[in-house]
Amino acid sequence: MLRVAVPNKGALSESATSILSEAGYRKRTDSRDLSVLDPENQVEFYFLRPKDIAVYVGSGELDLGITGRDLALDSGAPVQERLALGFGRSTFRYAAPAGREWKVEDLYDKRIATSYPNLVLSDLRRRGIEAEVIRLDGAVEISIQLGVADAIADVVGSGRTLRQHNLVAFGETLCDSEGVLVERVGADRDDRARNQLVARIQGVVFAQQYLMLDYDCPKELLDQAVQITPGLESPTVSPLADEGWVAVRALVPRGKGNSVMDRLADLGAKAILATDIRSCRAF
């Protein structure tokens, strides 16, 4: 029985649960449930604090886990990424009061508040900067105003929270984070149940990044159309009743869907349809 950790709440939880559901795994019906057994797929899911997931996986108690890259790195647990999942993207940066030009070197001998002390200490050591790192469990932005810290290191999304507290981010990004599937370093990658779950999740993540495009194309324009929609290996081309036309099907990156459709229409293609895909394999 495969044992998999899933975030029990927060920004990562909803997306992780959605991906697993799309991959064909059982969902919990009550948010208070701490575990869900999926006997059909031989998997048991455990709903844990995102910050603790890498620790459980790294200890070998659980086989796989979904958490944030920043949380996994900060845990110090012996885990490695198996898949990047494409949701919950954020950056982890230093921030300090606005009104002056800050450099990372200015943090020398300063107090830095953060919920990710190991990540910050690792970066400071790499830079040769000595500073006091103060661990807080949340709301680190207010720590400067309350006189607890001189600067902070935190997850930055839109930057709205920083602006509300008159803070400005500076320096290089410490970590570009997103939801990731992690496993213990040295895990057995020949395990069938493990590889099946990875393949299913990978198929859902891939499907979220692509659209299936179908269109009719004059035969004399096919070569030009294929240049616009090369697909992964090659597009599917099928004959139509009208011998002067063919039907073409190809995967296109979701972010380019509309521009590709515009180019095909300008070329002379007809009946251009874009369809969502839910999952795929062997890509």
Curated annotation (Swiss-Prot):
Pathway: Amino-acid biosynthesis; L-histidine biosynthesis; L-histidine from 5-phospho-alpha-D-ribose 1-diphosphate: step 1/9. Its cofactor is Mg(2+). It comes from Nocardia farcinica (strain IFM 10152). Signal peptide: none annotated. Its EC number is 2.4.2.17. It catalyses: 1-(5-phospho-beta-D-ribosyl)-ATP + diphosphate = 5-phospho-alpha-D-ribose 1-diphosphate + ATP. Catalyzes the condensation of ATP and 5-phosphoribose 1-diphosphate to form N'-(5'-phosphoribosyl)-ATP (PR-ATP). Has a crucial role in the pathway because the rate of histidine biosynthesis seems to be controlled primarily by regulation of HisG enzymatic activity. Keywords: Amino-acid biosynthesis, ATP-binding, Cytoplasm, Glycosyltransferase, Histidine biosynthesis, Magnesium, Metal-binding, Nucleotide-binding, Transferase. The keyword Phosphoprotein does not apply. Feedback inhibited by histidine. Belongs to the ATP phosphoribosyltransferase family. Long subfamily. One of its GO terms (biological process) is L-histidine biosynthetic process. It comes from the Bacteria. Transmembrane segments: none annotated. One of its GO terms (cellular component) is cytoplasm. It is found in: Cytoplasm. It holds the Pfam family HisG_C. This is ATP phosphoribosyltransferase. The lineage of its organism: Bacteria, Bacillati, Actinomycetota, Actinomycetes, Mycobacteriales. One of its GO terms (molecular function) is ATP phosphoribosyltransferase activity.
